[in-house]
Structure formats: C-alpha cells, structure tokens
Amino acid sequence: MTTTPLSPSTPSNAQVPDIQGRFGRFGGKYVPETLMPALAELETAYQKYRHDPGFQAELQQLLRDYVGRATPLYFAERLTAHYARPDGTGAQIYLKREDLNHTGAHKINNALGQVLLAKRMGKQRIIAETGAGQHGVATATVCARFGLECVIYMGVHDMERQALNVFRMRLMGAEVRPVEAGTGTLKDATSEAIRDWVTNVETTHYILGSVAGPHPYPMMVRDFHAVIGQETRAQALEKWGGLPDILLACVGGGSNAMGLFYEFVNESSIRLIGVEAAGEGVNTEKHAATLTKGRVGVLHGAMSYLLQDEDGQVIEAHSISAGLDYPGVGPEHSYLKDVGRAEYYSVTDEQALAAFQRLSRLEGIIPALETAHAIAYLETLCPQLDGSPRIIINCSGRGDKDVQTVAKFLIPQ
C-alpha cells in the first residue's frame, strides 16, 4: 500500500483553522512581535509547498523508503479475546502500528515534513523541544539525514527519565541542551526553544513537535500526521470493507490523536476518543488531564485549555509518561471537545502501568507509556459497548524508552 498526499479527503475540515489560525475560539498567534514575520514566512512557505508536486514526491518517497510507511493495521487477537464476553462477542481491537516507523514513533512524520520545508526556506539550523525524547530523536534523525545543525531542548527531569533517547540524539550529532527552569519538563523545554527562536529567527527553523503553539503549527503538524488516518481508512476498507466504529488515542499535546482523527472528523458515526494522563488522580494536584480539568488560557502562543490555578497561572502537570506531562493541549482538540465531536477521558499512572504489561504479555508488543494510556481506557470502554464494534487504537510509539522507568515501579528495590 502506498501513502497518500497530505490533502485530506474530508474537504469541510479545511474550514478549521480560519485565516487567523483559529479553531472556533481556540488557537491564534500570541507571540512576541519579533516572531510574527517568521510565522508569516512559515505559513506562506507551507501553503506554497503543501500542494507542490516536487515537495510531495520527495516527502512520499522518504515516508516510504526512509520511514517505512505505510504502517500496518494489526488485529490484536489476544487483546480482543481478553475483552470478549462469554458468548464470544465484544470489541474487535486493532492497532495502528506507528511504533514500527523508523525511530519508533509517529513523531518522524512531522519532523520529516518540517525539515523538507525548512530546507526550501533556506534555514540551516533546526531547533526542537522534546519531552519523552521521541520528537527529539526524530528531529535529530532527519537533521542527520540532511546534514543540518540540530539543537534539542529537554528538561533535566525528562533527561533523567529518558537517558537512552538523550544518547540517541547525541549519537546522531544533535546538541541536547538541558533545561533546569521550572519543573524541568516539556513546558519548560518548549519555553526555552521559543526563546532561542526569537534570538536566532533569521537562520533557524523551530520544529514544534505537537499540534500546539501559534498558527500555523497546529494546522501544519496535524497535516503532516494526517497520513496516519488516511492509511487507516484505506486499510479498514481493505480488511473489512468498512470504517471503524471507534478511534482511540492518547493525548498530551495531541499530535498522534489528531493524525488519526482528522481523516474521520466528518464521519459522524465514528466516535473519536482521546485519553489524557490522570497521573495520581484528577482530584489530586498531580495529573496532566488538561481537557478534563483545565480552563481556557494562553500558553506557548495559542489559546487552548490549560491547567491553571485561581490566579490564571499555569500549574505543573504530572504523568509517569514524559510525553503526556504537559499542562496544555493542541487548540484543535479544545475545539473538538467544545463542539462535542470528540470525547476526552483520563487514566492514572497505575492504570497505564497495568496496560503497559497487559499489551506486552498478550500481544508481545511493548507500547510507549503514552500509548499505554489509550490501551488502559479499554478497561472502561469495552464493558460499555454492545455488539462487536471495531476499535482502532493509535499505537503511537514503542516502549523501549520506558522500560527503565517501568522497571523502577514494578521491580522491588
């Protein structure tokens, strides 16, 4: 199966964002004046090249031969049996295997697209932020492939949790800059990357790793990941001659979920379910359930739901998963929540750890801790369902990077 071009097959989706970069009341550009010309330049370049045959041909060839797309749509037979009713009915569970991409996650779809764009814009220096390290690894990988200078900002706490990915980035020639400010996690790394971009905007392109940030990033990152949903549609039609009933994905910033959801936003019969990190519980102070518990505010250049205190100050997020440990969320997810098109729930660290083990033991697939949150929600979802609906879960990444973290919790010290 070949990958398909970026243009979505659901034309009315093109109505969001509007020309101001807004998804309803969310999104926009809340940035220093210094960055406005750079964002305008980026949007102009993106609109020019997204339909350019040469750009598309190069992107599709690299997605196929370098990344390894299309990724399989895998029927999880033993996971399905685990949730089956005594009469044999129950949800039919499929995994969209983004973990099989080069670098082990969905992140490379976007990193590759943005580097090809940066090259055409004449930028020789690339910066990025990373939490779990997968976006950093993907960016370092593509920069190595094209011989570009690469600087990755990563919180010191995340560097400890993801030491293997830090080594991978450095192995491929990237400079990894530790961020000690704040909680030393993804929010702080993003803030530091934006500061760098303000200072070096003439020579540097900032590859934001999620569907967050100022316009055009939420739109652009979504579009580079839309290949996930496009392949899923074709594979579902090929496998059973129809569409799925439910799509399920974890949500931190929300790029893997938007990549899967976007193709199906206008298919009103399909439930779109995002799963956030409840950490130690949504009624504690240690969680990252932004859409469940947040209020509207501005962070990193966009209006969206945020975790805030009574004074409107952004508060610390917590998750066992470094990739979900973020107090904001992409503005399109906020929009989909407000218009009632998508549903958002949360699972705890403990539930995610159990799901991490469950998928490993039942299917021989070790998922990323981020992905494990989506897997964990099956415990709640499956007993609620009638008949045998088809569920597709975005297996957004592999769990090699998390084995050390998980071992600390599961092996008595």
UniProtKB/Swiss-Prot annotation:
InterPro entries: Trp_synth_b_CS, Trp_synth_beta, Trp_synth_beta/beta-like, TrpB-like_PALP, TrpB-like_PALP_sf. It comes from Trichormus variabilis (strain ATCC 29413 / PCC 7937) (Anabaena variabilis). Tetramer of two alpha and two beta chains. It catalyses: (1S,2R)-1-C-(indol-3-yl)glycerol 3-phosphate + L-serine = D-glyceraldehyde 3-phosphate + L-tryptophan + H2O. This is Tryptophan synthase beta chain. It comes from the Bacteria. Keywords: Amino-acid biosynthesis, Aromatic amino acid biosynthesis, Lyase, Pyridoxal phosphate, Tryptophan biosynthesis. The beta subunit is responsible for the synthesis of L-tryptophan from indole and L-serine. The modification N6-(pyridoxal phosphate)lysine is found at K107. PANTHER family: TRYPTOPHAN SYNTHASE (PTHR48077:SF3), TRYPTOPHAN SYNTHASE-RELATED (PTHR48077). Belongs to the TrpB family. It is an enzyme of class 4 (lyase). CDD domains: Trp-synth_B (cd06446). Its EC number is 4.2.1.20. Pathway: Amino-acid biosynthesis; L-tryptophan biosynthesis; L-tryptophan from chorismate: step 5/5. NCBIfam families: trpB. GO terms for molecular function: tryptophan synthase activity. Its cofactor is pyridoxal 5'-phosphate. GO terms for cellular component: cytoplasm.
